[in-house]
A protein has these predicted regions:
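Anionic N-terminal interaction surfaces
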Residues: 1-5, 48-119
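Alpha-helical transmembrane spans
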Residues: 1-67
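Polar/charged alpha-helical tracts
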Residues: 38-41, 86, 189
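Cytosolic juxtamembrane helix at the C-terminal end of the final transmembrane segment
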Residues: 58-72, 130-140, 187-194
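Generic detection of short hydrophobic beta-strand segments and adjacent strand-loop junctions
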Residues: 78, 120, 133, 173-179
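Generic "edge-of-domain/loop-turn" microfeature
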Residues: 85, 126, 133, 164-166, ...
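Phosphoinositide-binding peripheral membrane targeting modules
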Residues: 103-155
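Acidic, Ser/Thr- and proline-rich intrinsically disordered linker/docking segments
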Residues: 139-200
């Protein structure tokens, strides 16, 4: 998630709008009519319910993001140059086309930042190019964390991810992170940390 604090604020505003519509429908149902007040109430309840959950999710992400950025609970961090990130982005598109669950959970921007990309890995979360992700809720069901060795260029760590669907089932994705040669020791440290967790 990019800009989690910004999304939390927007979600709070939309949730408040939903509550306001419900109150408006309740207090003006005589003046505006039953049909209009019912429509306002339904819209308001929908907004309030959806964005209340979105607010808490974004707020927790914002707190986690701030902690990692301050260095709290960081296991490793490394920098990916713009050239390396371009190579990774090309490979990521190829890898994601192999299977639906290999699509990257990180939404890679179309334009590579000229300064490159920072990766910060914590005990339960990761920041990739400013995008915050939890990795404490990795997918189960046979899929395991993976290290992609050469000839893959760059080497990558893959974390399986699973998001529940509202209608049942789940959406399976993969959080794929490049590990440049200069940061291989840091990448190995992260891989071993989470592999040990998976065994427990």
């Amino acid at each position: 998630m990019r800009n989690p604090l910004h999304k939390a604020l927007w979600s709070a505003c939309l949730c408040a709008l939903g509550v306001s519509l419900v109150l408006l429908a309740n207090f003006t149902h005589v003046q505006v009519g039953e049909i209009t007040s019912t429509i306002l109430g339904i819209i308001g309840m929908t907004l309030a319910t959806i964005f209340l959950f979105t607010f808490f999710w974004a707020l927790l992400s914002a707190i986690g993001y701030a902690r990692l950025m301050s260095g709290n609970g960081v296991i490793a961090r490394w920098h990916v140059t713009a050239g390396d990130w371009d190579r990774f982005r090309t490979f990521d598109e190829i890898r994601a086309s192999e299977h639906l669950w290999l699509r990257n959970d990180v939404r890679i921007r179309k334009l590579t930042p000229p300064q490159g990309v920072d990766v910060i890995v914590g005990r339960a979360s990761i920041i990739v190019d400013g995008s915050y992700h939890s990795i404490s809720d990795r997918a189960s069901g046979g899929r395991q964390m993976n290290w992609l060795n050469p000839p893959v260029d760059l080497e990558c760590i893959e974390f399986p991810k699973s998001y529940p669907r509202s209608k049942g089932g789940s959406v399976e994705l993969t959080l794929r992170v490049p590990v440049p040669a200069s940061a291989r020791a840091e990448g190995v440290r992260v891989f071993e940390h989470y592999r040990a967790e998976d065994k427990n």
